[in-house]
Amino acid sequence: MRDFKLSGPAWFDACPEPVILAHDGDTAYYNAAAAALAERSGWTLQEETPLPEPLRAIDGVGVQTLELAGEHWVCRTERLKAGLLICLTLSPSSITVPLERLAQMAERMRLPLGSLIGVSQLLAQSDGERTEEKTSQYQSIQRKSYYTLLRMLNTLETLGSLSDGRRPFQGEPLDLGGLCAEVVRRVQSVCDEAGCAVELRQNGGNLLVQGEDDLLRQMLYHLISNAIRAAGDGGQVTLELEKCREKDRRWVRLVIWDSGSGFKPEQLARAFDPAQGAAGLSDRSEGLGLGLVLCKRVAERHGGRLAVMTGASAVTAVELPLCDGLSFGALHSPSDLSGGINETLVQLSDVLPWQCFAEEE
Protein backbone atom coordinates (compact mmCIF):
# COMPACT_ATOMS: atom_id res chain seq x y z
CA MET A 1 0.00 0.00 0.00
CA ARG A 2 1.12 3.53 -0.66
CA ASP A 3 1.64 5.52 2.53
CA PHE A 4 -0.64 8.50 2.00
CA LYS A 5 -0.45 9.55 5.69
CA LEU A 6 -4.05 10.73 5.76
CA SER A 7 -4.41 10.76 9.53
CA GLY A 8 -4.08 13.94 11.58
CA PRO A 9 -3.56 17.34 9.95
CA ALA A 10 -2.64 15.79 6.59
CA TRP A 11 -6.22 14.55 6.29
CA PHE A 12 -7.83 17.81 7.39
CA ASP A 13 -5.57 19.90 5.14
CA ALA A 14 -7.29 18.13 2.23
CA CYS A 15 -10.78 18.43 3.70
CA PRO A 16 -12.95 20.78 1.57
CA GLU A 17 -14.89 22.05 4.60
CA PRO A 18 -13.78 24.09 7.62
CA VAL A 19 -11.99 22.16 10.38
CA ILE A 20 -10.65 23.78 13.56
CA LEU A 21 -8.92 22.24 16.57
CA ALA A 22 -9.39 24.14 19.84
CA HIS A 23 -7.30 23.69 22.97
CA ASP A 24 -8.20 25.50 26.20
CA GLY A 25 -10.20 28.08 24.24
CA ASP A 26 -7.39 28.83 21.78
CA THR A 27 -7.03 27.86 18.13
CA ALA A 28 -4.53 25.01 17.86
CA TYR A 29 -5.07 24.18 14.17
CA TYR A 30 -7.22 25.24 11.22
CA ASN A 31 -7.32 24.23 7.57
CA ALA A 32 -7.57 26.33 4.41
CA ALA A 33 -11.37 26.07 4.28
CA ALA A 34 -11.60 27.45 7.83
CA ALA A 35 -9.29 30.31 6.88
CA ALA A 36 -11.54 31.15 3.92
CA LEU A 37 -14.63 31.13 6.17
CA ALA A 38 -12.86 33.38 8.67
CA GLU A 39 -11.99 35.84 5.90
CA ARG A 40 -15.62 35.96 4.71
CA SER A 41 -16.82 36.41 8.28
CA GLY A 42 -14.27 39.05 9.26
CA TRP A 43 -12.79 36.88 12.02
CA THR A 44 -9.23 36.73 13.24
CA LEU A 45 -8.18 33.09 13.04
CA GLN A 46 -4.61 32.36 14.09
CA GLU A 47 -2.95 29.55 15.97
CA GLU A 48 -2.36 30.14 19.70
CA THR A 49 -4.96 32.92 19.76
CA PRO A 50 -8.53 32.77 21.18
CA LEU A 51 -11.22 31.16 19.05
CA PRO A 52 -13.42 33.56 17.06
CA GLU A 53 -16.38 34.79 19.12
CA PRO A 54 -19.10 32.68 17.36
CA LEU A 55 -17.17 29.49 18.16
CA ARG A 56 -16.34 30.16 21.80
CA ALA A 57 -19.71 28.94 23.05
CA ILE A 58 -19.12 25.47 21.59
CA ASP A 59 -18.39 23.01 24.37
CA GLY A 60 -18.49 19.24 24.59
CA VAL A 61 -19.24 16.82 21.79
CA GLY A 62 -22.29 16.53 19.60
CA VAL A 63 -24.07 18.22 16.72
CA GLN A 64 -25.56 21.70 16.61
CA THR A 65 -26.42 24.37 14.05
CA LEU A 66 -24.74 27.76 13.77
CA GLU A 67 -25.22 30.83 11.61
CA LEU A 68 -21.88 31.99 10.26
CA ALA A 69 -21.21 34.52 7.50
CA GLY A 70 -24.94 34.71 6.84
CA GLU A 71 -25.17 30.95 6.20
CA HIS A 72 -26.48 28.01 8.22
CA TRP A 73 -23.85 25.46 9.21
CA VAL A 74 -23.99 22.06 10.88
CA CYS A 75 -21.29 21.91 13.55
CA ARG A 76 -19.97 18.50 14.66
CA THR A 77 -17.57 18.35 17.57
CA GLU A 78 -15.41 15.52 18.85
CA ARG A 79 -13.15 15.42 21.91
CA LEU A 80 -9.61 14.34 21.04
CA LYS A 81 -6.48 14.06 23.14
CA ALA A 82 -5.16 17.20 21.41
CA GLY A 83 -8.34 19.20 22.08
CA LEU A 84 -11.83 19.82 20.71
CA LEU A 85 -12.19 19.06 17.00
CA ILE A 86 -14.74 21.33 15.28
CA CYS A 87 -15.98 20.26 11.83
CA LEU A 88 -18.36 22.55 9.93
CA THR A 89 -20.62 21.48 7.07
CA LEU A 90 -22.80 23.90 5.13
CA SER A 91 -26.46 23.04 5.72
CA PRO A 92 -28.23 21.90 2.51
CA SER A 93 -30.86 24.58 3.13
CA SER A 94 -28.15 27.23 2.72
CA ILE A 95 -26.94 25.95 -0.63
CA THR A 96 -28.26 28.01 -3.50
CA VAL A 97 -27.49 27.30 -7.12
CA PRO A 98 -27.11 30.44 -9.26
CA LEU A 99 -29.05 30.65 -12.50
CA GLU A 100 -25.86 30.60 -14.57
CA ARG A 101 -24.93 27.26 -12.96
CA LEU A 102 -28.36 25.84 -13.85
CA ALA A 103 -27.83 27.10 -17.39
CA GLN A 104 -24.46 25.34 -17.51
CA MET A 105 -26.02 22.05 -16.37
CA ALA A 106 -28.83 22.44 -18.92
CA GLU A 107 -26.24 22.99 -21.66
CA ARG A 108 -24.38 19.83 -20.65
CA MET A 109 -27.63 17.85 -20.78
CA ARG A 110 -28.42 19.36 -24.17
CA LEU A 111 -25.31 17.76 -25.72
CA PRO A 112 -26.35 14.09 -25.33
CA LEU A 113 -29.98 15.05 -25.97
CA GLY A 114 -29.04 16.67 -29.28
CA SER A 115 -26.97 13.64 -30.24
CA LEU A 116 -29.85 11.32 -29.31
CA ILE A 117 -32.32 13.27 -31.44
CA GLY A 118 -29.90 13.54 -34.36
CA VAL A 119 -29.08 9.84 -34.68
CA SER A 120 -32.72 8.89 -34.08
CA GLN A 121 -33.69 11.03 -37.07
CA LEU A 122 -30.97 9.42 -39.18
CA LEU A 123 -32.15 5.93 -38.21
CA ALA A 124 -35.74 6.84 -39.04
CA GLN A 125 -34.81 7.84 -42.59
CA SER A 126 -35.17 5.25 -45.32
CA ASP A 127 -31.73 5.00 -46.84
CA GLY A 128 -31.11 2.02 -49.05
CA GLU A 129 -27.42 2.87 -49.33
CA ARG A 130 -26.78 2.84 -45.58
CA THR A 131 -24.61 -0.10 -44.61
CA GLU A 132 -25.26 -2.38 -41.68
CA GLU A 133 -22.04 -1.12 -40.13
CA LYS A 134 -23.24 2.50 -40.31
CA THR A 135 -26.61 1.53 -38.82
CA SER A 136 -24.84 -0.21 -35.94
CA GLN A 137 -22.74 2.91 -35.36
CA TYR A 138 -25.83 5.12 -35.19
CA GLN A 139 -27.48 2.72 -32.75
CA SER A 140 -24.38 2.70 -30.53
CA ILE A 141 -24.27 6.52 -30.46
CA GLN A 142 -27.99 6.55 -29.71
CA ARG A 143 -27.50 4.15 -26.79
CA LYS A 144 -24.52 6.10 -25.41
CA SER A 145 -26.47 9.37 -25.54
CA TYR A 146 -29.45 7.84 -23.74
CA TYR A 147 -27.22 6.30 -21.05
CA THR A 148 -25.44 9.62 -20.52
CA LEU A 149 -28.76 11.40 -19.96
CA LEU A 150 -29.89 8.62 -17.63
CA ARG A 151 -26.68 8.96 -15.60
CA MET A 152 -27.20 12.72 -15.25
CA LEU A 153 -30.80 12.27 -14.11
CA ASN A 154 -29.79 9.55 -11.63
CA THR A 155 -27.16 11.89 -10.16
CA LEU A 156 -29.66 14.72 -9.74
CA GLU A 157 -32.31 12.42 -8.26
CA THR A 158 -29.93 10.83 -5.76
CA LEU A 159 -28.39 14.13 -4.73
CA GLY A 160 -31.84 15.62 -4.22
CA SER A 161 -33.03 12.73 -2.05
CA LEU A 162 -29.90 12.99 0.13
CA SER A 163 -30.14 16.76 0.47
CA ASP A 164 -33.77 17.12 1.53
CA GLY A 165 -33.79 14.27 4.06
CA ARG A 166 -36.61 12.29 2.42
CA ARG A 167 -34.51 9.13 2.19
CA PRO A 168 -33.98 7.42 5.57
CA PHE A 169 -30.76 5.48 6.08
CA GLN A 170 -31.30 1.76 5.50
CA GLY A 171 -27.85 0.29 5.85
CA GLU A 172 -27.12 -3.43 6.03
CA PRO A 173 -23.89 -5.36 6.65
CA LEU A 174 -22.09 -5.26 3.31
CA ASP A 175 -18.74 -6.60 2.16
CA LEU A 176 -17.09 -3.49 0.73
CA GLY A 177 -14.23 -5.58 -0.63
CA GLY A 178 -16.66 -7.76 -2.55
CA LEU A 179 -18.53 -4.74 -3.88
CA CYS A 180 -15.30 -3.09 -5.07
CA ALA A 181 -14.14 -6.34 -6.70
CA GLU A 182 -17.44 -6.68 -8.57
CA VAL A 183 -17.46 -3.07 -9.78
CA VAL A 184 -13.80 -3.20 -10.88
CA ARG A 185 -14.38 -6.48 -12.71
CA ARG A 186 -17.28 -4.90 -14.63
CA VAL A 187 -15.25 -1.78 -15.37
CA GLN A 188 -12.30 -3.84 -16.61
CA SER A 189 -14.59 -5.62 -19.09
CA VAL A 190 -15.25 -2.36 -20.98
CA CYS A 191 -12.13 -0.30 -20.32
CA ASP A 192 -10.09 -1.63 -23.23
CA GLU A 193 -12.07 0.64 -25.56
CA ALA A 194 -11.44 3.57 -23.21
CA GLY A 195 -7.70 2.90 -23.39
CA CYS A 196 -7.28 2.79 -19.60
CA ALA A 197 -6.19 0.01 -17.24
CA VAL A 198 -8.03 -0.39 -13.91
CA GLU A 199 -6.86 -2.60 -11.04
CA LEU A 200 -7.86 -3.33 -7.43
CA ARG A 201 -5.51 -4.10 -4.55
CA GLN A 202 -6.86 -5.36 -1.24
CA ASN A 203 -5.21 -5.73 2.12
CA GLY A 204 -6.94 -6.72 5.33
CA GLY A 205 -9.40 -9.57 4.70
CA ASN A 206 -13.13 -9.05 5.24
CA LEU A 207 -14.18 -5.42 5.10
CA LEU A 208 -17.72 -5.23 6.47
CA VAL A 209 -19.48 -1.88 6.61
CA GLN A 210 -23.05 -0.97 7.41
CA GLY A 211 -24.01 0.47 4.06
CA GLU A 212 -26.57 1.03 1.36
CA ASP A 213 -25.51 -1.03 -1.63
CA ASP A 214 -26.91 1.23 -4.35
CA LEU A 215 -25.38 4.43 -2.93
CA LEU A 216 -21.93 2.92 -2.32
CA ARG A 217 -22.02 1.40 -5.79
CA GLN A 218 -22.94 4.78 -7.32
CA MET A 219 -20.11 6.45 -5.37
CA LEU A 220 -17.58 3.89 -6.62
CA TYR A 221 -18.60 4.32 -10.24
CA HIS A 222 -18.41 8.11 -9.99
CA LEU A 223 -14.91 8.01 -8.47
CA ILE A 224 -13.67 5.49 -11.03
CA SER A 225 -15.19 7.51 -13.88
CA ASN A 226 -13.40 10.65 -12.65
CA ALA A 227 -10.11 8.75 -12.44
CA ILE A 228 -10.48 7.25 -15.94
CA ARG A 229 -11.15 10.70 -17.38
CA ALA A 230 -8.14 12.19 -15.59
CA ALA A 231 -5.82 9.32 -16.58
CA GLY A 232 -6.63 9.69 -20.27
CA ASP A 233 -5.76 7.31 -23.10
CA GLY A 234 -3.20 4.72 -22.07
CA GLY A 235 -3.57 5.70 -18.42
CA GLN A 236 -3.73 3.69 -15.21
CA VAL A 237 -6.32 3.75 -12.41
CA THR A 238 -5.67 1.91 -9.15
CA LEU A 239 -8.00 1.27 -6.22
CA GLU A 240 -6.56 0.20 -2.87
CA LEU A 241 -8.52 -1.10 0.11
CA GLU A 242 -6.96 -1.27 3.55
CA LYS A 243 -8.30 -2.12 6.99
CA CYS A 244 -7.15 0.45 9.55
CA ARG A 245 -7.25 0.56 13.34
CA GLU A 246 -6.36 3.14 15.95
CA LYS A 247 -7.23 2.25 19.55
CA ASP A 248 -10.98 1.47 19.57
CA ARG A 249 -11.63 2.94 16.12
CA ARG A 250 -11.72 0.57 13.14
CA TRP A 251 -12.27 1.71 9.58
CA VAL A 252 -11.63 0.83 5.96
CA ARG A 253 -9.75 3.22 3.71
CA LEU A 254 -10.38 3.23 -0.03
CA VAL A 255 -7.80 5.16 -2.04
CA ILE A 256 -8.17 5.79 -5.77
CA TRP A 257 -5.38 7.36 -7.78
CA ASP A 258 -4.71 7.78 -11.46
CA SER A 259 -1.75 8.44 -13.73
CA GLY A 260 -3.03 11.86 -14.81
CA SER A 261 -1.39 15.20 -14.12
CA GLY A 262 -3.51 16.15 -11.09
CA PHE A 263 -5.58 19.28 -10.54
CA LYS A 264 -4.86 22.87 -9.66
CA PRO A 265 -5.67 23.93 -6.05
CA GLU A 266 -8.25 26.45 -7.28
CA GLN A 267 -10.04 23.67 -9.15
CA LEU A 268 -10.27 21.50 -6.05
CA ALA A 269 -11.52 24.45 -4.02
CA ARG A 270 -14.80 24.41 -5.97
CA ALA A 271 -15.07 20.66 -6.53
CA PHE A 272 -17.44 20.10 -3.60
CA ASP A 273 -19.57 23.20 -4.14
CA PRO A 274 -22.89 22.35 -5.89
CA ALA A 275 -23.17 26.00 -6.93
CA GLN A 276 -19.91 25.71 -8.91
CA GLY A 277 -19.27 22.01 -9.36
CA ALA A 278 -16.28 20.06 -10.59
CA ALA A 279 -17.09 20.30 -14.27
CA GLY A 280 -13.98 22.40 -14.76
CA LEU A 281 -11.66 19.73 -13.38
CA SER A 282 -11.23 18.27 -16.84
CA ASP A 283 -11.56 19.58 -20.37
CA ARG A 284 -12.98 16.17 -21.30
CA SER A 285 -15.82 16.30 -18.77
CA GLU A 286 -19.26 15.52 -20.14
CA GLY A 287 -21.07 15.35 -16.79
CA LEU A 288 -22.87 17.84 -14.58
CA GLY A 289 -19.91 18.48 -12.27
CA LEU A 290 -21.82 17.07 -9.28
CA GLY A 291 -20.13 13.68 -8.95
CA LEU A 292 -17.77 14.62 -6.11
CA VAL A 293 -20.59 16.42 -4.31
CA LEU A 294 -22.63 13.21 -4.46
CA CYS A 295 -19.69 11.02 -3.37
CA LYS A 296 -19.00 13.24 -0.37
CA ARG A 297 -22.67 13.11 0.70
CA VAL A 298 -22.67 9.31 0.42
CA ALA A 299 -19.48 8.96 2.48
CA GLU A 300 -20.82 11.24 5.22
CA ARG A 301 -24.18 9.43 5.22
CA HIS A 302 -22.28 6.25 6.09
CA GLY A 303 -20.41 7.92 8.95
CA GLY A 304 -17.29 8.39 6.85
CA ARG A 305 -15.42 11.14 5.05
CA LEU A 306 -13.90 11.89 1.67
CA ALA A 307 -10.86 13.91 0.67
CA VAL A 308 -9.27 14.78 -2.67
CA MET A 309 -5.58 15.59 -2.92
CA THR A 310 -3.44 16.54 -5.86
CA GLY A 311 0.23 16.47 -6.64
CA ALA A 312 1.91 14.48 -9.38
CA SER A 313 -1.56 12.93 -9.84
CA ALA A 314 -5.01 13.14 -8.29
CA VAL A 315 -5.76 11.01 -5.22
CA THR A 316 -9.21 10.46 -3.75
CA ALA A 317 -9.57 8.80 -0.35
CA VAL A 318 -12.72 7.56 1.37
CA GLU A 319 -12.84 6.30 4.95
CA LEU A 320 -15.83 4.31 6.23
CA PRO A 321 -16.32 2.78 9.71
CA LEU A 322 -16.17 -1.00 9.93
CA CYS A 323 -18.79 -3.15 11.64
CA ASP A 324 -18.52 -6.73 12.91
CA GLY A 325 -21.61 -7.85 10.99
CA LEU A 326 -23.01 -9.69 14.01
CA SER A 327 -25.16 -6.91 15.39
CA PHE A 328 -26.92 -6.26 12.11
CA GLY A 329 -28.17 -9.70 11.04
CA ALA A 330 -27.17 -11.54 7.89
CA LEU A 331 -24.42 -10.33 5.59
CA HIS A 332 -25.77 -8.47 2.56
CA SER A 333 -24.14 -9.46 -0.71
CA PRO A 334 -23.84 -6.96 -3.57
CA SER A 335 -26.87 -7.17 -5.85
CA ASP A 336 -27.62 -6.10 -9.40
CA LEU A 337 -30.29 -3.38 -9.41
CA SER A 338 -29.80 -2.33 -13.04
CA GLY A 339 -33.22 -3.54 -14.19
CA GLY A 340 -31.82 -5.07 -17.36
CA ILE A 341 -29.77 -2.03 -18.42
CA ASN A 342 -26.00 -2.42 -18.32
CA GLU A 343 -25.24 -0.42 -15.18
CA THR A 344 -21.53 -0.12 -15.95
CA LEU A 345 -22.19 1.42 -19.36
CA VAL A 346 -24.62 3.88 -17.79
CA GLN A 347 -22.22 4.91 -15.03
CA LEU A 348 -19.23 5.25 -17.38
CA SER A 349 -21.15 6.67 -20.34
CA ASP A 350 -19.37 10.03 -20.07
CA VAL A 351 -15.89 8.49 -20.47
CA LEU A 352 -16.45 5.51 -22.80
CA PRO A 353 -16.38 5.85 -26.61
CA TRP A 354 -19.46 4.97 -28.65
CA GLN A 355 -17.88 1.69 -29.76
CA CYS A 356 -18.54 0.30 -26.25
CA PHE A 357 -22.29 0.66 -26.71
CA ALA A 358 -22.82 -1.81 -29.55
CA GLU A 359 -25.80 -4.08 -28.92
CA GLU A 360 -24.78 -7.31 -27.22
CA GLU A 361 -25.57 -10.47 -29.13
What is each of the regions a protein language model found here?
Residues 164-169, 208-211:
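Conserved micro-motifs of the catalytic ATP-binding
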Residues 1-35, 103-105:
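Sensory modules in modular signal-transduction proteins
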